[in-house]
């Protein structure tokens, strides 16, 4: 999640189209997502020796910790428009307006910009890690887990107290690299996935489901067999 000026926004997976009522299975959503490449966060292969020599480190360093990320620039040293929105370098409302125009079959106002950013604009940007299991809160009265992802105050507090994910490096493909393993984007180490899985497994809702495998903890009813 990004968290700026007391406002949060899910950035991985990106929810730009979901905010318009388009589910991930929607054909329109799939088409638009592929056209605009809304997801900029990606996982690095575990063995960094496979690709690290293909890039020049322009600022900072490759991730050394689980909560560190690196920005991979294009061969020309640029970032995508979507990455600029994700990093807060361009107003996210501008993107939302374009998507809304597209979904309403209106003429999309696309203003091409050649914004210039320096490395300090990108380095040390932070995001918040929120475990999906924490979206749920136990209801003592009905003895079920309720999804609180639509509760803005609940989510705001959850995001605000989430773990920090920080961009610590910026890399660019070397001039002599004919092929590179990583496309442009924001990359996190594979250890972050392991961290999220371990944390999810220890969560109360998951533990309750494991210990009551015949009971659906979301409905309080037995699973149909």
Where do the language-model regions lie?
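Basic-flanked hydrophobic alpha-helices used for secretion and membrane insertion
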Residues: 1-225
